[in-house]
């Protein structure tokens, strides 16, 4: 069976602002199945941003579990992420899920992987997905050499990734927190 490919998710934090954005392309083999998928969401009463890459069904399953962990830990992003990663790593069914998440609240940005990793990215920039390396490189260059707002850095980084990665389009959803 062919694998779904695609997605670029990038987050930039500067000062008291954080932006998280993603493209809208879902690809099956060499066919674009959808160009307007929404892979970035606000959860926990709009206080937490989350973006996902990987298998869509797996990502939604993890998103539901992550929301439950946020409720359990009263919005403590780090505790919720670590608990989700522990479950993801130790549960046989969850271990098969193929997705990654970037989560952000007013204070913290974390990357959560299926390997049980919870990573606090250096420099306030994180990116995942097929175009993640392009977006992260562009975001890093822009953040270090301009005074652009995080939302603008995310938009430009996604644009560059969309120009270089065949699994990334230029239909973006970008959310911000201040």
UniProtKB/Swiss-Prot annotation:
Its main location: cytoplasm. SUPFAM superfamilies: N-terminal nucleophile aminohydrolases (Ntn hydrolases). One of its GO terms (cellular component) is HslUV protease complex. It is found in: Cytoplasm. Na(+) binds at residues 162, 165, 168. Its EC number is 3.4.25.2. One of its GO terms (biological process) is proteolysis involved in protein catabolic process. Allosterically activated by HslU binding. It is an enzyme of class 3 (hydrolase). Keywords: Allosteric enzyme, Cytoplasm, Hydrolase, Metal-binding, Protease, Sodium, Threonine protease. Belongs to the peptidase T1B family. HslV subfamily. A double ring-shaped homohexamer of HslV is capped on each side by a ring-shaped HslU homohexamer. The assembly of the HslU/HslV complex is dependent on binding of ATP. This is ATP-dependent protease subunit HslV. The gene is hslV.
């Amino acid at each position: 069976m062919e694998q779904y490919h695609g997605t670029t998710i990038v987050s930039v934090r500067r000062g008291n602002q954080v932006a998280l954005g993603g493209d809208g392309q879902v690809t099956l083999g060499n066919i674009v199945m959808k160009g307007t998928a929404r892979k970035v969401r606000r959860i926990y009463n709009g206080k937490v941003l989350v973006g996902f890459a990987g298998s869509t069904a797996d990502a939604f399953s993890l998103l539901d579990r992550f929301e439950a962990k946020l409720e359990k830990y009263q919005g403590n992003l780090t505790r919720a992420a670590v608990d989700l990663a522990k479950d993801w790593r130790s549960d046989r069914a969850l271990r098969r899920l193929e997705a990654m998440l970037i989560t952000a609240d007013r204070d913290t940005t974390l990357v959560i992987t299926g390997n049980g990793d919870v990573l606090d990215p250096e420099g306030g920039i994180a990116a995942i997905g097929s175009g993640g390396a392009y977006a992260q490189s562009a975001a890093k260059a822009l953040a270090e050499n301009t005074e652009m707002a995080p939302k603008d850095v995310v938009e430009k980084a996604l644009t560059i990734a969309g120009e270089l990665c065949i699994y990334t389009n230029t239909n973006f959803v970008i959310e911000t927190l201040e």
